[in-house]
Amino acid sequence: MIPDVGFLVLLTGALFICIKAAPATTDVDPTFEGRIVMEGDILIREEQLTERNAIALENMRWPDATIVYKLTGWYALFPGDIKKAMRHIEENTCIKFKARSNEEGYVKIYKGEKESCFADIGYFASEQRLSLGSGCKIFGRILHEMGHTIGLFHEHTRPDRDNYITVHEDNIRPGSKRNYRKTPSYMTRVIGPFDYDSIMIYGETAGSRDPMHLKSMEANKPGVTLISSRYKDRLTDLDIKKINTLYNCPGKEKFS
């Protein structure tokens, strides 16, 4: 998630980049390198936001279900859980990961500043970003951000989410309320049933102005607790089936 600050400084190699973000008191989406930051950790290009370009969503799938990546800096030396997450996805879906040679479209995986966890959504024929700051080097968080790279939006912002969860806007910090907007139906393909345990759902106190006492959202289903991806160690069966459906994976179980 990109922090709610007036200015965000990221370290990329030896280059310091100063990013003007939206003030924490507003509900305007901040920007990063020409992308709009949606829902806290999704980078999306402006041309992908208009209804007339909704067909572009079909082109956001990685060609041949192969994600081309480049590990940089710290992660090039210590790929650890990143490679483990890649193997977990490969073992359960038709998605493959390939180290970049000279491909035009690829995802650069790098160590962002502090809690800077975010990723471009899906495929684009240029360099894309997957930032894993020091607070994001956790297996479940890595899987979550890779889910965005694959093309998955958040489960709690599905257009039909109100049937399954209740968002308590009064409990959410002003600068975090934008992270709970429903994704427009023309931007996302709703696949399968709502998954309370998805790797793509936030914990129920994320963005709360008082996490010890106030929930940002909660399940409408009695007895269900919404848990952050940082405490998870795998994709759920529904996550896997959704990815296999999105990429029409041959020989894999899919939603009809």
Swiss-Prot record:
SMART domains noted in UniProt: ZnMc (SM00235)
Tissue localization of expression: Expressed by the venom gland.
GO molecular function, one term: toxin activity
Cell wall biogenesis/degradation found in the keyword field: no
Activity regulation, free text: Inhibited by 1,10-phenanthroline.
Names of required cofactors: Zn(2+)
GO cellular component, one term: extracellular region
Keyword Protease: yes
Domain of life of the source: Eukaryota
Residues annotated as signal peptide: 1-24
Limits of the Peptidase M12A domain: 53-250
Disulfide bonds: 94-249, 117-136
Active site annotation, chain numbering: 145
Cited PROSITE patterns: ASTACIN
Key words, A-Z: Disulfide bond, Hydrolase, Metal-binding, Metalloprotease, Protease, Secreted, Signal, Toxin, Zinc
InterPro entries: Astacin-like_dom, MetalloPept_cat_dom_sf, Peptidase_M12A, Peptidase_Metallo
Classification via PANTHER family: DISCOIDIN, CUB, EGF, LAMININ , AND ZINC METALLOPROTEASE DOMAIN CONTAINING, METALLOENDOPEPTIDASE
Subunit description: Monomer.
Protein name: Astacin-like metalloprotease toxin 2
